[in-house]
């Protein structure tokens, strides 16, 4: 029989840098999860993605065991990395901070495809382009 699920915890943690300090420790501690075991396993799984923020969904079971699924980094983080900028524009309609090519948008869309609810690559590309525009990044043809 399957284990009884007690709760789900969603966090965004820098790859390879999970520590028992907030926000990880308190979120896991209130569910009674072994914090060090999670941190060690997460850091091993995400060591190759250093420098990116990785969303993770942790499933906590009644016997205080856990399992977790890592997702692809947020589109905004990938766009900022592709454009080599620190942050998006505070006023995206008036102030443009960078430019991104269609090829880079395609690469990001291919990387994000498993986590997006898009039927085709073109639909995923338009989602990524919309995120870029909302950050003040111009998408070039």
UniProtKB/Swiss-Prot annotation:
> Subunit arrangement?
Part of the ribosomal stalk of the 50S ribosomal subunit. Interacts with L10 and the large rRNA to form the base of the stalk. L10 forms an elongated spine to which L12 dimers bind in a sequential fashion forming a multimeric L10(L12)X complex.
The superkingdom listed in its UniProt entry is: Bacteria
A cellular component annotation (GO) from this entry: cytosolic large ribosomal subunit
- What is the annotated role of this protein in its UniProt record? Forms part of the ribosomal stalk which helps the ribosome interact with GTP-bound translation factors.
Gene3D superfamilies hit by this protein: Ribosomal protein L11, C-terminal domain, Ribosomal protein L11/L12, N-terminal domain
Q: Could you give a GO molecular-function term held by this entry? A: structural constituent of ribosome
Q: Give an example GO biological process.
A: translation
Q: Which HAMAP family match?
A: Ribosomal_uL11
Q: What is this protein called?
A: Large ribosomal subunit protein uL11
* Statement: the UniProt record of this protein carries the keyword DNA damage: no
Which keywords does this chain's UniProt record carry?
A: Methylation, Ribonucleoprotein, Ribosomal protein, RNA-binding, rRNA-binding
Entry comment on modification after translation: One or more lysine residues are methylated.
Q: Return the SMART domains for the record.
A: RL11
Family of the protein in this entry: Belongs to the universal ribosomal protein uL11 family.
